[in-house]
């Protein structure tokens, strides 16, 4: 299956992949390991069943080129989940209370997703995740209080068929002010 040649199916798959990668790319973190404020998550090296997916910039470009009503609907859905499109990736706001807790709620609380830290070795943490239509393992590397990376491998069912997927994500702190990106509640 070539994801790049089917515009409608590609768009649906890319929307699902954006949601999937956002949920999987944000592991739990320890108290005050990260700065509060606006964060940008950029995914790369995304593969489904061994096939390389288009670059994140291309996927974001496709979403930016949606008809105005579809784009507004997509942006509203993301806003309700506490994220927005911006720059090179997906943006999320973390409050001081969130970074001081042991649980950074970047995934939608209503999504049914859970994450569990399975090993901590300094600034490298391994974790497992489980969502209604995805599960797998990952590793987070905290480079500083303003940057971390994750690598995840798992299975998901975004199209009605079980698929294997993997991706890398880089998360960077953009600053203390979140602007119009509301924090997760």
What function would you assign to each model-found segment?
Residues 11, 17-18, 93:
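Small/flexible residues
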Residues 1-12:
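Short, Lys/Arg-enriched N-terminal segments with co-localized hydrophobic residues
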Residues 32-185:
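Subset-of-secretome marker
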Residues 27-31:
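Sec/Tat signal peptide C-region and signal peptidase I cleavage site
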Residues 17-25:
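Sec-dependent N-terminal signal peptides
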